[in-house]
Amino acid sequence: MVKEGKAMEIKEAFDLSQKAHQNHAKLVSSLRAAYNKTEDKSIFLEEFIHFLKFPLIVYRREPAVERVMDFVAKFVTSFHNSGGENEEEADEENSPVNCLFNFLLQSHGASSMAVRFRVCQLINKLLVNLPENAQIDDDLFDKIHDAMLIRLKDRVPNVRIQAVLALARLQDPSDPDCPVSNAYVHLLENDSNPEVRRAVLTCIAPSAKSLPKIVGRTMDVKEPVRKLAYQVLSEKVHIRALTIAQRVKLLQQGLNDRSAAVKDVIQKKLIQAWLQYSEGDVLDLLHRLDVENSPEVSLSALNALFSVSPVGELVQNCKNLDERKLIPVETLTPENVLYWRALCEHLKSKGDEGEAALENILPEPAVYARYLSSYLQTLPVLSEDQRADMTKIEDLMTKEFIGQQLILTIGCLDTSEEGGRKRLLAVLQEILVMQNTPTSLISSLAELLLFVLKDDDKRIQTVAEIISELREPIVTVDNPKDAAQSRKLQLKLADVKVQLIEAKQALEDSLTNEDYSRASELKEKVKELESLKTQLIKEAEEPEMKEIRVEKNDPETLLKCLIMCNELLKHLSLSKGLGGTLNEICESLILPGITNVHPSVRNMAVLCIGCCALQNKDFARQHLPLLLQILQLDEVKVKNSALNAVFDMLLLFGMDILKSKPTNPDDSQCKAQENADEDISEQEKPGSVDENLTNEEVQEETATVNGILHLFSGFLDSEIAEIRTETAEGLVKLMFSGRLISAKLLSRLILLWYNPVTEEDTKLRHCLGVFFPIFAYSCRSNQECFAEAFLPTLQTLFNAPASSPLADVDVANVAELLVDLTRPSGLNPQNKQSQDYQAAMVHDGLAIKICNEILKDPTAPDVRIYAKALCSLELSRENSTDLLPLLDCAVEDVTDKVCERAIEKVRSQLRSGREEHRVSKETEPQVSKETEDRTNLQENEEGKQKDEANCDENTDTVKEKAARGKATKGRRKGPAAAATRRKASKAEEAEAEMERQEESQCVPVNTRPSRRAKTAALEKTKKNLSKLLNEEAN
């Protein structure tokens, strides 16, 4: 321990600093006292550096060494931390700080990676322990700067990490040309070690130049790097420094990350930090995310916020609602309506507790229905002039977004009460029929209407009525009057006028004659005639109005009707079928929509035809040619829809719908699978089709199948990425479902996956990358399909011209993939017990194909790829009869030494394994005979019943071990094709063949244990029997 008032020696200080519970402050103080008492400071520093060299050569992160490094850094920097004379001394060239830095800078280029690592580590610790206001000589600063920049390029990752940490205080983020910042950016993008990238993320200062690189690390392949990148963004970067696109991208990627740790950082750090930057206002945060263009990302962010808050607190924070539990229409914004919807959906997912809380923020269905209807009625219908004004369009889009969110909130309402449900249905139907309802809202409205209606017949009837009302509304029109009727009315009016004149004249005469009773009667008559005259004049002037239904064929109306029809068909069960109503809709609405000039109408009509085809097989067969024609002629969007419709039909009904006449589904599926993999000439086999079909029908059907597959194959080469991706995805689904088995198409898909043209098509590559291993390892027949595609795929790559993108593909990598996909050891364990797995393995047949390909041209450069693939195969020693002669010929014919050695290794390993198998078969009868003799000897010598029982038990033990050995026969523990093989002559092969034939006659075909297992069992038996015999002798 340190004794007060007494200076310490340097060695003792280094020794004590290694201990875990030592107080480094006291050690520093004592060593400082010894330094101050030393007259010649240079001798002290030399001795100090001498003892420092010992921990510098230790590379492992030993705790004792780490403590020594900390102590050295604290001691040296203590000369900077003190004031007065020591500060002046610290500025001198021979000060401890400068002296140590100079020594470290001289040693940073040492050949020992331990020294380089510790030097960079100590420089880092020195710079970290220096105070904020510390000053370093410019020359020393430049030396440290240059040395650490050199160490950033060190071949050892740990050295680069320490150099990164050491340069953290030397960077200048305000300088766009700062060498440290540029080096950090370079390492962040290009360093292969994830720990180095993490170190850079820890140290780099965010700036206009480095921020995009930090954001880019959120897509790093390593989870710890992605996690740290999000942490840095949440702690060091203000939300305003990020663009809206960057914010949305960060949330979208982070909340959908495969790692739970990354999601946790997004939820608990990044979003919470952004919320603090928005002063706790969730609506302000949503405004910064642009909810109109990214509603799904905003919903995910809201759900992340809701998940860390109790239900009661969420309900209290919902302050935008009035006494009706509604947001006033005049205060509706995209942010508050989305927040309201997200909160309702979150509470509904919380079970009973959430349902109770939901009643506090949502009204009754009838009240909400009136509220929704009143808002949607305010949506304007823009005229042609207004459509040219972007402000008007943006305002309309905002209102449509609000309406969309209000519609989706209906799913959270409690529709169990009959009255509220009926009122809601009535309002939804009224909204769907309204002329000012935007097309963008029709799909959501129809989906919710069908969600409330549970019966399929009621759904069909309701949608049909809405379509009829929307397409044929009641219109009041002028009814032109008949000429004769109009003339009759004029005559009647003239007669009334004459009567009126006569009555007025008689009234005047009566008043003159003072006949007041007569005058009273005439006065009443004049009033009646005046009224009749007025009525006749009105009838003559006003046109007759009539209410009639007028069919509307404008694109907007047709699109609304088709959208509702499509939603209806999607919600119907496949067993429902097409009834009279749907057939009528199809004839009057869907099929005419195919020829419409507007692409959106045609696209929706194609989607409807695809849904109708899934309801009826005959309908699918009838309209398949129409869809195939659309595939080749229409626009990209319509093509995609038609393509998906065709694939859906093939998935549901199989290739049977390609036939002109219905046949047995099982037969049609089998024939379709055969046709998909063979040429027309190979398909014309009498035994592969139904006997009732004529040769002409067979040829027509096979031509149809091959024509469609040729069409799909052509789409795989399409320049349009969407068509290429949809085709590949559809073919993958057909193959995985067993509807289509084709090695040729499988080869095309493999080439498409490797083609550099598809490098940017993430969806396509992800789809194929998931499909290949799942399809290959699901069953043995699929592996056979890959084996059949092996040679065609490689030959296509070998023969690719230099101008083709396939010329840049690594053929060795393709061969390695195909070998790996056909490994028997990778097969699903559930299928390994099946009967077809017990047959000859896929690699045995593939090896024969490869050998034949090598023998075709042994001098070709492609032989190296084949030989390497041959070495990677898992070959069975039991089925090597056909393969060994081919290997012998290949060894003799191949001229390339590398290929010859590779083939020789395969042959040698195969022969040694076969010899082992033969010896084990010969040994088995001998072992059985020896075991039987020993058992008889034991029974003869034993005299007691107990010993006989023990002997029987040991005999049973031997049999059980032998049985277990037989059960394990044939199981392979891993690839054995790469073991060393020795060369053998053809005479030896012939002799081995004769021995094999003799064994097959006298030895049963039953599987046998290996020789080693049998010998071990025999040795155990010998020991047990000897023990028993000794006990008997005693």
From Swiss-Prot:
Signal peptide span: none
Biased composition (Basic and acidic residues): 909-949, 985-999
Localization of this protein: Nucleus; Cytoplasm; Chromosome
SUPFAM superfamilies noted in UniProt: ARM repeat
HEAT repeats: 95-132, 139-176, 178-213, 242-279, 281-317, 439-476, 618-655, 703-740, 785-823, 878-915
Record keywords, A-Z: Cell cycle, Cell division, Chromosome, Cytoplasm, DNA condensation, Mitosis, Nucleus, Phosphoprotein, Repeat
Coiled coil location: none
Biased composition (Polar residues): 663-672
Post-translational modification: Phosphorylated by cdk1. Its phosphorylation, as well as that of XCAP-D2 and XCAP-H subunits, activates the condensin complex and is required for chromosome condensation.
Chain intervals for the UniProt region annotation (Disordered): 663-693, 909-1034
Biased composition (Basic residues): 964-984
Gene3D superfamilies listed in its UniProt record: Leucine-rich Repeat Variant
Subunit field text: Component of the condensin complex, which contains the XCAP-E/SMC2 and XCAP-C/SMC4 heterodimer, and three non SMC subunits that probably regulate the complex: XCAP-H/NCAPH, XCAP-D2/NCAPD2 and XCAP-G/NCAPG.
Function comment: Regulatory subunit of the condensin complex, a complex required for conversion of interphase chromatin into mitotic-like condense chromosomes. The condensin complex probably introduces positive supercoils into relaxed DNA in the presence of type I topoisomerases and converts nicked DNA into positive knotted forms in the presence of type II topoisomerase.
Entry similarity comment: Belongs to the CND3 (condensin subunit 3) family.
Protein name (Swiss-Prot/TrEMBL): Condensin complex subunit 3
